[in-house]
């Protein structure tokens, strides 16, 4: 072994001066830095000689068969893998992620790279006498793990998680960070990508998100292509590396985004806010985790209540919202959510393009479920009587309709008023469900055969409440907030209340007239439309339209001081949340009056997010041209007070925000350049990020910037003090007889959130209180071990739980996983066999149509992408009844299968209705057929 290693050492010393521009070599720090850090993975190097490396360099990538140069060979003992680098598909990195083989050598330069340590390794270090170090995860030493193929563990032992050390909870920047702050790395422009670079730098300087990827990088696991979360993890690791590279190239992340969203292909300039939404949507989709919830069945319930209220008093409590629909419209203008299924599957059951809008609705529905349960459980909703009116008289005639839905307003649920005060139906908080470890095991009767029908979330009895799928991710934890809007009919005084989840606020920039209305509406009882900036930008008639355009053009060319008072961010917020009269062409359809009525719409925030993203609507796209509103909007660097926009019954404690970063656009609507100003969290200084250039700037420079997107973070000195107190306790390390396991994700919240919420250990526990089998292989990435005194302090301060002293693989989940895996395999094999037989038929007599929406759910289940089987077959969206016959709806999203395949799926899942297509039968006259045969014979004879 020593001799073989000597070959590599001598060879490496010869070729080290040869340095090529390779993707992985961009990550290689200087040589002295590498020598100062010992790599604990050198003991895994197998025996290899110079001749072996030369022979491998003449070969090809074992996956894509591309030839060198710059192939990478795995150095793991008994592994002969050779893969391509980042100049191609980067199969070498994929191999390392899948096998946890960390050491690889470039067969052209013979330089060695360790994926786990994220640094260059010199093999002559292994020849020394220094003992090997145990592998301990450092705070910023990230290990890129991918999702392994699902295998049921054969044993019930778990790796012992690490004990939390002082660095795990320390939030103070050390002296080295203050002198040479990390995170000051630029991003190279790779073809009009300044919009992406500015957006990435703004997100990179959001500590809750970046710290999640740096400290919980092992949780960036997904089997969904193109694995944006892994590319983002890699980028954050490079940007915040202690070696402080001058700039990096975000090629992998950009290629992944372009694969999913065609908008960003090519080299044209794009919108930074659109890129932000697309990126965060993809990260949520890949990182989301399911949390089981219990919900009333039926889903749509209406409550009858009376409201005889003083209208003026109602106006006092609610300012109007031109509306929450502003953000809806902005979102729709920028395109639908961008998701994609894995296009590289070896077996596509039915070739069909993924319906991105449906997937968008699915996620919006998931996020809706997240916020519904959080809002209702904490009692902040409670029909919001006080927020609507302080004088409410109840009788049995009038109605308050409570709606809860997502931003797209696609999924609406009306809630019983008596349910709103029934906490046992919903969990006590979003992150903690006290029944997760106390619930009885799921039914073991999980499809023992093909005969019994299986229905999703099937209840044992009609009276049982059904389980509803709820999802959360680090994205929703950080950026999701809730708006409560209310529409009051001015005829019958009926009030309809709606909860909407938002990830950013798209604020209008009020003009001079709008500012005058906002500032003059100091009397809250007057019903005045005082913030409908949309009206100012949508005049009726061509003459007014042209004059408005000329006016805005002149305004954009003349300094803002010439036109009147300075517009502040508070003005934009007031315009967004202002009272909105619904009249004229915009009358309210009252469900009680059954007519169009005049109404008033109010809007306030029920829950503020940890990081508030504010988008200023500077770009307006007219019929034939686009314009940019260049009005300067002043914004505070610290102390943004959002108390005036908070709902009265909101449980929010912290409503003050400090600025983290701001994205600016210089230029016109058709061309321009994006930069970002960001505050470094380690030294609290402001920097300008202009592609690969990073420059320190003053606070006044930031305040004078033309803001387009702003990121604000909740400010809490109390949270800072609490973190320091816990860090000091951890540094003392009192001896204790018991050790407690705690979620890494929650610890990240504790370190970076102003309001971390109750402790939640449910991300590594199943509903039975054990570790799910699929998480057993990487449990050390999910938990840390705390001494008893630290746990006691955290638990007494934040509550939650459950307390965990012992980790074990859940036997019940293991049995269920084996059953469900067997079911997947059987259903998939039978479908493939039946579908192949169907494809061989030349002219089938009948076709059975099936909803592609349902089929995609079933396909995700049998391929292991979704843990739950779909519900009954639902063909109602593709079927239409004419003259008593069920026919295929024109343009329906449907697929064609054989009768045998339909019977197979229907026998398992049930549902319907049957939609049958019968190809028309062409009757041929025998005389004509005989004449054609005669002509054919004569032709052949010639």
From Swiss-Prot:
Bias (Basic residues) ranges: 453-469
One Gene Ontology term, aspect cellular component: nucleoplasm
InterPro entries the record matches: DUSP-like_sf, Papain-like_cys_pep_sf, Pept_C19_DUSP, Peptidase_C19_UCH, Ub_carboxyl-term_hydrolase, USP_CS, USP_dom, Znf_RING/FYVE/PHD
Chain residues that bind Zn(2+) 1: 39, 41, 114, 117
Tissue occurrence: Widely expressed.
Keywords carried by this UniProt record: Cytoplasm, Cytoskeleton, Endocytosis, Golgi apparatus, Hydrolase, Metal-binding, Phosphoprotein, Protease, Repeat, Thiol protease, Ubl conjugation, Ubl conjugation pathway, Zinc, Zinc-finger
Entry's localization field: Cytoplasm, Perinuclear region; Cytoplasm, Cytoskeleton, Microtubule organizing center, Centrosome
GO molecular function, one term: G protein-coupled receptor binding
Zinc finger (UBP-type): 37-140
E.C. numbers: 3.4.19.12
Modification after translation, per record: Ubiquitinated via a VHL-dependent pathway for proteasomal degradation.
Active site location: 194 (nucleophile), 673 (proton acceptor)
List of residues binding Zn(2+) 2: 61, 64, 84, 91
Domain USP, first and last residues per copy: 185-715
Domain of life (superkingdom): Eukaryota
Database matches in Pfam families: DUSP, UCH, zf-UBP
Catalyses which reaction(s): Thiol-dependent hydrolysis of ester, thioester, amide, peptide and isopeptide bonds formed by the C-terminal Gly of ubiquitin (a 76-residue protein attached to proteins as an intracellular targeting signal)
Bilayer-spanning residue ranges: none
Segments forming domain DUSP: 717-810, 818-921
Biological role: Deubiquitinating enzyme involved in various processes such as centrosome duplication, cellular migration and beta-2 adrenergic receptor/ADRB2 recycling. Involved in regulation of centrosome duplication by mediating deubiquitination of CCP110 in S and G2/M phase, leading to stabilize CCP110 during the period which centrioles duplicate and elongate. Involved in cell migration via its interaction with intracellular domain of ROBO1, leading to regulate the Slit signaling.
Family: Belongs to the peptidase C19 family. USP20/USP33 subfamily.
Name of the featured protein: Ubiquitin carboxyl-terminal hydrolase 33
Native species: Homo sapiens
Gene: USP33
């Amino acid at each position: 072994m020593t001799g073989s290693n000597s070959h590599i050492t001598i060879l490496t010393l010869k070729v080290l001066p040869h340095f090529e521009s390779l993707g992985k070599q961009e990550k290689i720090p200087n040589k002295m830095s590498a020598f100062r850090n010992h790599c604990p993975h050198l003991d895994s190097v197998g025996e290899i000689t110079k001749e072996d490396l030369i022979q491998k360099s003449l070969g090809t990538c074992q996956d894509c068969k591309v030839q060198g140069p710059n192939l990478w060979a795995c150095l793991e003992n008994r592994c002969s893998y050779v893969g391509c680098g980042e100049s191609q598909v980067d199969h070498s990195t994929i191999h390392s992620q899948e096998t946890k083989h960390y050491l690889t050598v470039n067969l052209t330069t013979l330089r060695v790279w360790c994926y786990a340590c994220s640094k260059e390794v010199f093999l002559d270090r292994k020849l020394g006498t220094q003992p090997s170090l145990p592998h301990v995860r450092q705070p910023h030493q990230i290990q890129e793990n991918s999702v392994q193929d699902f295998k049921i563990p054969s044993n019930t032992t778990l790796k012992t998680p690490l004990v939390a050390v002082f660095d795990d909870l320390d939030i103070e920047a050390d002296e080295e960070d203050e002198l040479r702050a990390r995170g000051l790395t630029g991003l190279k422009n790779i073809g009009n990508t300044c919009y992406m670079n500015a957006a990435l730098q703004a997100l990179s300087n959001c500590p809750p998100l970046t710290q999640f990827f740096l400290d919980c990088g092992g949780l960036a696991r997904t089997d969904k292509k193109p694995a944006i979360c892994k590319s983002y993890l890699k980028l954050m690791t490079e940007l915040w590396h202690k070696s402080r590279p001058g700039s990096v190239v975000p090629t992998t992340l950009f290629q992944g985004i372009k694969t999913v969203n065609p908008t960003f292909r090519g080299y044209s300039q794009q919108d930074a806010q659109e890129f932000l939404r697309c990126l965060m949507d993809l990260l949520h989709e890949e990182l989301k985790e399911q949390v089981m919830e219990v919900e009333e069945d039926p889903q749509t319930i209406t409550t009858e209540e009376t409201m005889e209220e003083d209208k003026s008093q109602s106006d006092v409590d609610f300012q109007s919202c031109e509306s929450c629909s502003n953000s809806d419209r902005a979102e729709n203008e920028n395109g639908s959510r961008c998701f994609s299924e894995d296009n590289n599957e070896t077996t596509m059951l039915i070739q069909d393009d993924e319906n991105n809008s449906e997937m968008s609705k699915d996620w919006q529905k998931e996020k809706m479920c997240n916020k519904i349960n959080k809002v209702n459980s904490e009692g902040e909703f409670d029909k919001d009587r006080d927020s609507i009116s302080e004088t409410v008289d109840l009788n049995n005639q009038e109605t308050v309709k409570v709606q809860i839905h997502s931003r797209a307003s696609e999924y609406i649920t009306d809630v019983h008023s008596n349910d709103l005060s029934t906490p046992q139906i919903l969990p006590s908080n979003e992150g903690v469900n006290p029944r997760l470890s106390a619930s009885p095991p799921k039914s073991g009767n999980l499809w023992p055969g093909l005969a019994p029908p299986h229905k999703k979330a099937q209840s044992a009895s009609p009276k049982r409440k059904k389980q509803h799928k709820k999802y959360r991710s680090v994205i929703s934890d950080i950026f999701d907030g809730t708006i409560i809007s209310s529409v009051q009919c001015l005829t019958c005084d009926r009030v309809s209340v709606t909860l909407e989840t938002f990830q950013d606020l798209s604020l209008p920039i009020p003009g001079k007239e709008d500012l005058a209305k906002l500032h003059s509406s100091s009397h809250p009882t007057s019903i005045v439309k005082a913030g409908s900036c949309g009206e100012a930008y949508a005049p009726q008639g061509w003459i007014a339209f042209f004059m408005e355009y000329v006016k805005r053009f002149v305004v954009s060319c003349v300094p803002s001081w010439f036109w009147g008072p300075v517009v502040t961010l508070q003005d934009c917020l007031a315009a967004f949340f202002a009272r909105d009269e619904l009249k004229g062409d915009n009358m309210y359809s009252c469900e009680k009056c059954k007519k169009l009525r005049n109404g008033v719409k109010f809007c306030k925030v029920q829950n503020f997010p940890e990081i508030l993203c504010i988008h200023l609507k500077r770009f307006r796209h007219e019929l034939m041209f686009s314009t940019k509103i260049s009005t300067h909007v002043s914004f505070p660097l610290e102390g943004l007070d959002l108390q005036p926009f908070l709902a009265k019954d909101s449980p929010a404690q912290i409503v003050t925000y400090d600025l983290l970063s701001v994205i600016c656009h210089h230029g016109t609507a058709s061309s321009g350049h994006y930069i970002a100003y960001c505050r470094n969290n380690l030294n609290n200084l402001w920097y300008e990020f202009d592609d690969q250039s990073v420059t320190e700037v003053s606070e006044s420079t930031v305040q004078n910037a033309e803001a387009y997107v702003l990121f604000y973070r909740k400010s809490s000195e109390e949270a800072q003090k609490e973190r320091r107190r816990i860090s000091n306790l951890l540094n003392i390390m009192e001896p204790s007889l018991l050790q407690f396991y705690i979620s890494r994700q929650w610890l990240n919240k504790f370190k970076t959130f102003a309001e971390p919420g109750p402790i939640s250990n449910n991300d590594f526990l199943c509903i039975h209180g054990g570790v799910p089998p699929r998480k057993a292989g990487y449990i050390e990435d999910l938990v840390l071990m705390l001494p008893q005194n630290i746990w006691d302090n955290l638990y007494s301060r934040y509550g939650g739980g459950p307390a965990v002293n012992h980790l074990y693989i859940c036997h019940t989940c293991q049995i269920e996983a084996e059953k469900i895996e067997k079911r997947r395999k059987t259903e998939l094999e039978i479908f493939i066999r039946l579908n192949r037989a169907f494809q061989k038929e030349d002219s089938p007599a009948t076709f059975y149509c099936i909803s592609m929406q349902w089929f995609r759910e079933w396909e995700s289940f049998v391929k292991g992408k979704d843990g739950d089987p779909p519900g009954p077959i639902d063909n109602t969206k593709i079927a239409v009844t004419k003259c008593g016959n069920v026919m295929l709806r024109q343009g329906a999203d449907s697929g064609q299968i054989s009768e045998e395949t339909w019977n197979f799926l229907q026998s398992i899942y049930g549902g319907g209705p049957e939609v049958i297509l019968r190809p028309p039968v062409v009757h041929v006259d025998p005389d004509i057929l005989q004449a054609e045969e005669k002509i054919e014979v004569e032709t052949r004879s010639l």
